[in-house]
Amino acid sequence: MASKPAAGKSRGEKRKRVVLTLKEKIDICTRLEKGESRKALMQEYNVGMSTLYDIRAHKAQLLRFFASSDSNKALEQRRTLHTPKLEHLDRVLYEWFLGKRSEGVPVSGPMLIEKAKDFYEQMQLTEPCVFSGGWLWRFKARHGIKKLDASSEKQSADHQAAEQFCAFFRSLAAEHGLSAEQVYNADETGLFWRCLPNPTPEGGAVPGPKQGKDRLTVLMCANATGSHRLKPLAIGKCSGPRAFKGIQHLPVAYKAQGNAWVDKEIFSDWFHHIFVPSVREHFRTIGLPEDSKAVLLLDSSRAHPQEAELVSSNVFTIFLPASVASLVQPMEQGIRRDFMRNFINPPVPLQGPHARYNMNDAIFSVACAWNAVPSHVFRRAWRKLWPSVAFAEGSSSEEELEAECFPVKPHNKSFAHILELVKEGSSCPGQLRQRQAASWGVAGREAEGGRPPAATSPAEVVWSSEKTPKADQDGRGDPGEGEEVAWEQAAVAFDAVLRFAERQPCFSAQEVGQLRALRAVFRSQQQETVGLEDVVVTSPEELAIPKCCLEASTET
C-alpha cells in the first residue's frame, strides 16, 4: 500500500526524498515509544508513514550502533547502517584499533591504513580496495570514531546519551515483555588479594622479601532482582594452583589467563557454558518456560566478543555505550561497592608460621562477599536504567532485607541456633596482631553503619569452659575427657578437619563453606579469650563476627 503524503503537501505534489540522520531516527523511535502522534512526526521530519515503520523496524540495529559509537557526532553525520564490502576486514581492523586505544597507544591515520593493508594481505583477499583518505574517513564515520589520538579508552560521561539509552532499554524490555527476572548485568573487577599492608615494626620497614600482590579478575553476574546470582568466575594466572590440589568443590568457576584478565575466548566460553545453562535452570526453578527470553547487559570492552557471537536461542546481549556505562550500569550503582566492602582481604606476611592464606582462601572470600550483597542493593542498582524494577518492592520487604543483612544475634541459644549463626562466619585466615586488628575492626564497624560488636558472643555458648560437660559421678569419664586442649592445638585440629573435608567428595560445597565459617568463629573467640598480641585472627571483621558468609559455595 502506498504511503500517504506527508501533512502539508497536496496530493498532486511529489514529496522530496528525505534521508534522516541516525540521530533523527533514534529521536523518532524515542518519541514513538512515548506515544507521540505519527502524523505530527511525519509533518516535522517530512517523511511518509512507511518511513516511520521502517525506522521502527530497525530500532535494534540503531541501538547496537549507538552502543558502540565513540560519540554522538557519528549519529549526527551518518545516515545509513550499510555494511562495508570487506566486512570481515573492517571488523578485525576495528578490534585492533580498540585494543591499541585501550593500551593508550596513539594510532594515526597512516598507521591505520598500513594496518588495513597488512590485514588485507594476511587474509589473502582478492576483492579490490583502495585504502585512501576517503576510505579512512568512511571507516571513522562507520564506527563513530571521533579522534584517533586514543589517549584513553575511558570516555567522559554523556548524560544526554544516557537518557537516550535508558529510553531505548525500557522500550526494548516492553517490546519483548521482559521481567526483572530475565534481565542480567555482568561486569569484571580486579582484586589484589595479597595487597593489604602488613604489620610493621614501629619506625622500620618490613624485613624480608617484598610482599606479593597476586591478582584475580572476578566476573560477577546477576539479574535485576538479585534472586539469581551466578557463581563468580575467577581468572588467575596459574592454570593449576597448588592450593586447589585435591579440592573437590570450588565456590567459583576458575579459569587461567597469562595476565589474569578476561579475554574474548574466556568470556565466550563463560557465556555459552555457564551463563546460558544457569539462566535456563533458573527459569525452570521459578516456573518460566525454558525458551523465555533473557538479556545480558554489558559494557563496551575489548574483552567482550561481538554481539552476534553472544547469542544462544532466546538469550542475547546488549552493549552499553562507553560514555554511558559509568552513569547507568547497574554493577557501578552500588553492587561492586558492596562486594568490595564485603570482600575480606587480610594481610599475609611472607615469613612466619601462619603464612597460609592462599588462592583457595581468596576464592572462598570472593564467594562470601558476593553472596553477602543484599537483594535490595541489586534492585536499587537498576533505579536509573529501569526505575520500575527498583521501586517494585514495598517498604516492608526492604525492612526484611535489612534485617537479613544485619541480624540481631541472641546471647543464649541452643546449639542448633548456633549452627545457623556459624553460617555467617568468615573464611579468610591471615595473621594480624591485636593492636592492628582492633584499629582495623573499628574501621570495619564504621563501614557497616557503626554497629559495635556485642559484649558477649553467641559462640561462647559452644566454647566457654564453664559450659563444658562434667565427668560422671563415679569419676569415670570418656577416654581423654579430663585432658585440656590448648587453643593452639584446637586451631591445628580445625585446619586439619577443613583440609580433609575439602578433599573428600562426600562433603558438599555448602558443608565445606560451613566448616570454614565455623573455623572463623572459633578464631574470633580465641582472640577474645587469649588476648595475646600474636594470636592469629582471620580478619578485622571477625572481631565483630561478620554479617555474612551464608552458603558461600552455592548460587542463591
From Swiss-Prot:
Expressed ubiquitously. PANTHER family: JERKY PROTEIN HOMOLOG (PTHR19303:SF11), TRANSPOSON (PTHR19303). It holds the Pfam family HTH_Tnp_Tc5. The modification Phosphoserine is found at residue 414. InterPro entries: CenT-Element_Derived, DDE_SF_endonuclease_dom, Homeodomain-like_sf, HTH_CenpB_DNA-bd_dom, HTH_Psq. Residues 77-149 form the HTH CENPB-type domain. GO terms for cellular component: cytoplasm; nucleus; ribonucleoprotein complex. Keywords: DNA-binding, Nucleus, Phosphoprotein. Residues 38-58, 110-142 bind DNA. GO terms for biological process: positive regulation of canonical Wnt signaling pathway. Its main location: nucleus. May bind DNA. Residues 213-382 form the DDE-1 domain. Residues 439-482 are annotated as: Disordered. Residues 467-479 have a biased composition (Basic and acidic residues). Belongs to the tigger transposable element derived protein family. This is Jerky protein homolog. GO terms for molecular function: DNA binding; mRNA binding. Residues 11-62 form the HTH psq-type domain. It is found in: Nucleus.
